[in-house]
Amino acid sequence: MKRIFAIGALLLGSVAMFAQPQLTKDNIDEVVAAMTLEEKATLLVGSGWGSMTAGSMTASATALVPGAAGTTRSIERLGIPSTVLADGPAGLRISPIRDNDPNTYFCTGFPVGTVLASMWDTERVEELTTAMGNEVLEYGADVLLAPGMNLHRNPLCGRNFEYFSEDPFLTGKTAAAYINGIQSNGVGVSVKHFAANNQEVNRMENDSRVSQRALRELYLKGFEIAVKEADPWTVM
């Protein structure tokens, strides 16, 4: 009798395991509904620049695509894979050298954001970032952490080279073309840095005091244009 109960419990457990929905492009709502609260929180946390100890999420990203910035956790029971995020914005940034591998993994150094905006040619920008997105795809990353689209407000900002211009309209239009090119490859972007992160103190500090009018007319306008015209996968 005990053996019968044990076999019955095993069969019920197997049925429950196989009854879990597996992620496809058509059943996202069903999979989200099946996630536990802990799984949802874990998925949102992602990895950072913390320890590289075995089992850490950053170590996991390094194992998937060496040199990638980070990854989300996979949820195997629902078929949710890790999402690999890699830095831009002037092309994919990964490690060219890998352990026990004689090959060198080169990425193209594309023009920085200020140069792209200086062309005043959104078609050319999209053509260029289509090639950039192809490298993201071929090297196994899922999301490029780009474009940077804060405004040029202070010449001492150390990240001005990443950003397009001092004008929100030019910034938004250039960003939209940039995004469309990258995402035409089936990989995503993360537009950054939302919002008003236009200059920093010693890289790690920021104190932005902005009026409502300036925020809407200047610092948010480029993001608005990019989101409406290009539908980026993520926002940083």
Functional labels for PLM-detected ranges:
Residues 1-22:
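Bacterial Sec-dependent N-terminal signal peptides
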